[in-house]
C-alpha cells in the first residue's frame, strides 16, 4: 500500500442520549446519537402497536355491499 494516501482511521465514541457509549473506528469525529439499540423501542420490545383493527372493520363494513368474499 502507498504511504500517505489513506485517511486517518482512529477510534471514536458514539454517545447516545440514554447514556450508552459505543467505541468504534472512523475517519470522522465523535458522534452524539438520539437513539441506539439500547433505548430504541423496536430493540427493547416496548413498541406501540397501532390499533388498525377498527379501520379494517370499517372498510369491510363499507364494502360488504359489493358482495365480495367474507
Curated annotation (Swiss-Prot):
Its cofactor is Zn(2+). PROSITE patterns: RIBOSOMAL_L31. One of its GO terms (biological process) is translation. Keywords: Metal-binding, Ribonucleoprotein, Ribosomal protein, RNA-binding, rRNA-binding, Zinc. GO terms for cellular component: ribonucleoprotein complex; ribosome. Signal peptide: none annotated. GO terms for molecular function: metal ion binding; rRNA binding; structural constituent of ribosome. InterPro entries: Ribosomal_bL28/bL31-like_sf, Ribosomal_bL31, Ribosomal_bL31_A, Ribosomal_bL31_sf. Binds 1 zinc ion per subunit. Zn(2+) binds at residues 16, 18, 36, 39. Part of the 50S ribosomal subunit. Belongs to the bacterial ribosomal protein bL31 family. Type A subfamily. Binds the 23S rRNA. This is Large ribosomal subunit protein bL31. It comes from Tolumonas auensis (strain DSM 9187 / NBRC 110442 / TA 4).
Amino acid at each position: 500500500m502507498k504511504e500517505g494516501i489513506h485517511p486517518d482511521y482512529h477510534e471514536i465514541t458514539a454517545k447516545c442520549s440514554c447514556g450508552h457509549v459505543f467505541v468504534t473506528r472512523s475517519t470522522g469525529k465523535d458522534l452524539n446519537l438520539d437513539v441506539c439499540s439500547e433505548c430504541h423501542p423496536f430493540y427493547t420490545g416496548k413498541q406501540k402497536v397501532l390499533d388498525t383493527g377498527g379501520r379494517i372493520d370499517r372498510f369491510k363494513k363499507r364494502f360488504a355491499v359489493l358482495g365480495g368474499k367474507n
